[in-house]
């Protein structure tokens, strides 16, 4: 265990393409050997995007999301941070971004080698916020991109995975990492982001042999085998109009 993790709670580890990675309960991914922190699908300014269309959500999602990244940055002191696409909710997000939040982003990008991976929501990250843009990042046996393509060693986002299991008296639904040991899909870290159940057919295309879910808990990541997972629609059920 690295010094950066020494003061954290019990850690969960996963292996991907032979590399040891740490899925964090906040939703980030830590690669100790490279001092690399990965976060995905921040969707900054999603609240203001909805407000502009008349759906008045509290305008605090960007601040809450940045606070998580800032906390992980302070705890782990990464050399590099990769924001794995859909960092901003839309192309006009920078026009709605309060200057106080812009300053916090610039503080992060100036303190680290910050890489904005291009997403489907934000192909052109704002240049004035610092960092550098890449479509794909390759580092050792791992490749980082926004949308999964099924390549061995791939770390991607985009699908916003969630796992559902039976709890004590009720079902529990949590954001999660999804992996088969060869490829990994990150959870969405954004405060207002929803999620797609890992039993959805979209994940079957990425993990044809099945997957393990690493569910985010309070201060801990829980490993869930495929047999314990529940779908959002009971098996055999059909939608009725």
List PLM regions with ranges.
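Extended recognition/assembly regions associated with phosphoester-bond processing machinery
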Residues: 1-241
């Amino acid at each position: 265990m690295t010094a950066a993790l020494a003061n954290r709670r019990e850690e969960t580890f996963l292996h991907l393409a032979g590399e040891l990675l740490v899925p964090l309960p906040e939703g980030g991914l830590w690669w100790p050997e490279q001092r690399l922190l990965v976060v995905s699908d921040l969707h900054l300014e999603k609240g203001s995007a909805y407000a502009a269309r008349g759906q008045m959500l509290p305008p605090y999602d960007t601040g809450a999301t940045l606070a998580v990244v800032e906390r992980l940055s302070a705890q782990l002191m990464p050399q590099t941070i990769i924001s794995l696409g859909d960092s901003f909710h839309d192309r006009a997000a920078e026009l709605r971004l309060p200057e106080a939040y812009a300053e916090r982003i610039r503080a992060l990008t100036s303190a680290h080698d910050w890489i904005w991976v291009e997403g489907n929501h934000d192909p052109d990250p704002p240049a004035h916020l610092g960092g550098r843009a890449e479509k794909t990042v390759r580092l050792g046996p791992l490749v980082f991109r926004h949308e999964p393509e099924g390549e061995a060693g791939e770390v991607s986002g985009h699908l916003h995975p969630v796992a559902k299991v039976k709890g004590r008296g009720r079902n529990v639904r949590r954001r999660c990492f999804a992996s088969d040991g060869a490829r990994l899909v990150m959870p969405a870290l954004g405060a207002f982001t929803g999620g797609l159940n890992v039993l959805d057919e979209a994940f079957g295309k990425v993990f044809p042999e099945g997957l393990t879910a690493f569910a985010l808990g309070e201060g801990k990541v829980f490993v869930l085998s495929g047999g314990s997972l529940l779908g959002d629609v009971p098996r055999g059920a059909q939608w009725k109009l």
